[in-house]
């Protein structure tokens, strides 16, 4: 969140000159706080015909399975972010491939970019944000324990296409 360096006065909610949306504005210095969507990056990581899955050790969706994914950091590309998340969550070094899909989740202010990737050397383990990590054959994936709908969508599209062909808009609760 951007905040003015020396905010002395109270923030007010108003529409700034030349803008069309209500935003928080510092009553003293006029600093405008823009709240923008967060970018989530991740990868459907393959090792042969198996998919790398992580069991979450953090909320939301503690104890549910997901692909390695998380918030993109400043100063990194989406591809670098997806590779970093695989290393953090599954101790996995990956080679990023094609973009599978871009998923807009406006209700929670997220844009999710999911890539196809390959595990480089077959090595993986549960990282600090994961309870477990495993390579699953398609029929071994714990379908009833998947953390987020966009994981299912990316997995399904990744298995069919391997690249992005359309943008999906998810209006439902991503925690279900």
Question: What is the predicted role of each segment?
Answer:
Residues 72-96, 101-157, 166, 175:
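Unchanged
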Residues 15, 43-44, 124-127:
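Short secondary-structure boundary/capping segments
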